């Protein structure tokens, strides 16, 4: 097995007892990674949330991100340390913290198995639900531009019955329309600039993002 932490291969999935499809070099899909019963628990949470719940949860998720990344709790403290923090007004109602901590732990332990054989990496696991309703898109970006430690992005899909909302890699001309329960993993590199196309009328798109970082020794 390679000692290069960037080179995730199908062997890593096999050792973790997952069957992965490599749909493009270094883009992997694992079907049914999130189990039906787990999907039901997640659906129960966001089905009971109102718009104010989403807004409050988004703000709390930002505070957690700042604390995790910079070791401080407020925007002012992070900015005083020289970090640039920007609030995206379009996303204030689109992220919610996963309330079922047991489920969150189960998903992260399962995900960590895939990367267990790679030295020098650490999982920044799922912790929030991301939603995109009609007209909402995720702009093109490379995750390591905001955090240079990011090696891989992981996206777990709660549903796949939405229209539009494809994961799009414009530089390699790849579009992915996931199914419920799918896990998609891809590297944070220039060729893998990516975004999510606008969701059309109908069901909302729900996904759980996670990242794999280069460990700071």
Where are these regions (language model features)?
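A short catalytic or substrate-binding loop motif that flags glycine-/basic-rich loops and adjacent residues
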Residues: 22, 121, 132, 146-150
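Conserved short histidine dyad/triad with adjacent acidic residue
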Residues: 130-146
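Catalytic core of Fe(II)/2-oxoglutarate
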Residues: 145-146, 150, 161-217
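Non-heme Fe(II)/2-oxoglutarate
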Residues: 2-118
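Beta-strand elements of modular eukaryotic interaction domains
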Residues: 18-19, 119, 143-145, 197-199
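Short beta-strand segments enriched in hydrophobic/aromatic residues
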Residues: 34, 46, 158, 212-214
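A short coil-to-beta-strand element that immediately follows conserved catalytic motifs
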Residues: 118-128
């Amino acid at each position: 097995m390679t000692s290069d932490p960037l080179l995730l291969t199908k062997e890593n999935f096999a050792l973790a007892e997952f069957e992965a499809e490599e749909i493009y070099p270094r883009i992997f899909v694992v079907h049914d990674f999130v189990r039906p019963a787990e999907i039901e628990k997640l659906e129960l949470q966001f089905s009971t949330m109102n718009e104010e719940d989403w807004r409050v949860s988004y703000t709390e998720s930002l505070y957690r991100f700042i604390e995790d990344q910079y070791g401080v709790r407020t925007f002012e403290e992070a900015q005083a340390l020289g970090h640039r923090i920007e609030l995206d007004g379009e996303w204030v109602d689109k992220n919610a913290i996963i309330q079922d901590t047991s489920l969150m732990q189960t998903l992260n332990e399962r995900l960590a198995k895939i990367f267990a054989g790679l030295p020098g990496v650490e999982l920044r696991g799922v912790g929030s639900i991301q939603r995109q309703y009609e007209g909402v898109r995720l702009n093109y970006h490379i995750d390591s531009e905001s955090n240079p430690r990011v090696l891989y992005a992981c996206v777990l899909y709660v549903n796949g019955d939405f229209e539009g909302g494809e994961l799009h890699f414009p530089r390699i001309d790849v579009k992915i329309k996931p199914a419920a329960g799918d896990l998609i993993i891809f590297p944070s590199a220039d060729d893998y600039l990516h975004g999510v196309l606008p969701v059309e009328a109908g069901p909302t798109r729900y996904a759980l993002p996670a990242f794999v970082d280069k460990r700071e020794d």
